[in-house]
């Protein structure tokens, strides 16, 4: 029997937005078109036009011992070419940003191959072969509605600000001020790369999304938008997981009675 993934429980718009992010068959709306070289500048791992640094020869030139995995798993392009691993990291405002750390983790795992990701309270990192990282950074992480220039920050270090109030232009606080609001154009400009090194020229990532639009596409439950208590199914699943994890922490012995009951032994 084929398994059809449900991705996420719930009947609210928030739950549906989470399912859209995770489902690789759903193509998110493209909102901007940042040039490839501009993406490279923000990432800060290499200069535009510079060759990719490698850590091993191309796979086809390597003499592997017998390894069944290499015949089962198709390597991503960067792995084929021996390109090094690099990262991009985002901080998401709790004020209706399109994504948030756990949503990013689940989305990355569903949509991308050859990645590693780490979840923290206010930021989410994704590591990948540099060649492939640049492609997904442009085509999904930045160009689509997964990203908002005001409430999502590309921050490789000093990420604080996700829980602070937005400024008068709707921008999330950034201690390194990697980006600024251009009052003439109404666009957000990155003046530093993701770790805070000044750029020779600003990178325009477009205008902030309207607050009412963010409220419709966000994956964050909020009392002043859609609260989690409004989503009965999602709340039930969370409670089931919480109870199982809590009881499981005391050992499987606590499940013995329940298991016997399910097996019809009592």
Swiss-Prot record:
How does the record describe its quaternary structure?
A: MCR is a hexamer of two alpha, two beta, and two gamma chains, forming a dimer of heterotrimers.
Q: Does the keyword Transferase apply?
A: yes
The free-text note explaining how the cofactor binds reads: Binds 2 coenzyme F430 non-covalently per MCR complex. Coenzyme F430 is a yellow nickel porphinoid. Methyl-coenzyme-M reductase is activated when the enzyme-bound coenzyme F430 is reduced to the Ni(I) oxidation state.
The UniProt keyword set, sorted, is: Methanogenesis, Transferase
What protein name is recorded for this chain?
A: Methyl-coenzyme M reductase II subunit gamma
Task: State a single Gene Ontology molecular function.
Answer: coenzyme-B sulfoethylthiotransferase activity
List, alphabetically, the Pfam families matched: MCR_gamma
The cofactors named for this UniProt entry are: coenzyme F430
Describe the family membership recorded for this protein in Swiss-Prot or TrEMBL: Belongs to the methyl-coenzyme M reductase gamma subunit family.
Q: Which gene encodes it?
A: mrtG
Reactions that this protein is recorded to catalyse: coenzyme B + methyl-coenzyme M = methane + coenzyme M-coenzyme B heterodisulfide
Q: List the disulfide bonds.
A: none
What's its job? Component of the methyl-coenzyme M reductase (MCR) I that catalyzes the reductive cleavage of methyl-coenzyme M (CoM-S-CH3 or 2-(methylthio)ethanesulfonate) using coenzyme B (CoB or 7-mercaptoheptanoylthreonine phosphate) as reductant which results in the production of methane and the mixed heterodisulfide of CoB and CoM (CoM-S-S-CoB). This is the final step in methanogenesis.
Q: Where along the chain is coenzyme M bound?
A: 123
> Pathway it acts in?
One-carbon metabolism; methyl-coenzyme M reduction; methane from methyl-coenzyme M: step 1/1
Q: Which organism is it from?
A: Methanocaldococcus jannaschii (strain ATCC 43067 / DSM 2661 / JAL-1 / JCM 10045 / NBRC 100440)
Q: What is its EC number?
A: 2.8.4.1
Query: GO BP, one example?
Result: methanogenesis
The EC category is transferase
